[in-house]
């Protein structure tokens, strides 16, 4: 199947990676048209959800320190739209250099943004990278410096 850019946003286009948070990157794709072609109408004859896992979620805390975690995003099948995958990745990457604060503030932002984009109430669970319950990850030997108290204002090579 060939998708048109107008119908599916940035899919298939060369894209610049965002340097700051932007919820407008989320590109919804309406479920109704595909369901109508399949003869599926409301009420839906099934239940379900789309589950997205973000294994490399990162953002900055209020002091500018990088934070990392894993996220599970659940979008109900009853939502008006799904989110186009490339736009979802760009949205997640837009968080990387943005001062957000703690993981709860990030979770609230993501719930609001994704719920608005898909037209349904989503759930987001964020797990710290150091406590990946439910995400089978093997840890390497070494010293974790993620919790070191420092203020960071410059993110480039040494001057």
Language model regions located:
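N-terminal intrinsically disordered, cationic/polar leader segments
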Residues: 1-159
């Amino acid at each position: 199947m060939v998708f048109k850019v107008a119908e599916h946003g940035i899919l298939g286009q060369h894209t610049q990676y965002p340097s700051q948070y932007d919820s407008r990157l989320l590109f919804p794709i309406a479920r109704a048209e595909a369901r109508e072609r399949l003869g599926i109408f409301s009420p839906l004859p099934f239940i379900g959800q789309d589950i997205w896992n973000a294994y490399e979620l990162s953002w900055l805390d209020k002091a500018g320190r990088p934070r990392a975690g894993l996220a599970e995003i659940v979008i109900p099948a009853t939502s008006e739209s799904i989110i186009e995958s490339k736009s979802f990745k760009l949205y997640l990457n837009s968080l990387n250099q943005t001062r957000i604060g703690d993981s709860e503030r990030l979770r609230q932002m993501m719930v609001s943004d994704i719920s608005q984009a898909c037209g349904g109430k989503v759930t987001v669970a964020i797990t710290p990278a150091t406590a990946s319950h439910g995400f089978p990850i093997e840890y390497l030997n070494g010293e974790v410096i993620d919790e070191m108290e420092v203020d960071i204002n410059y993110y480039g090579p040494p001057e």
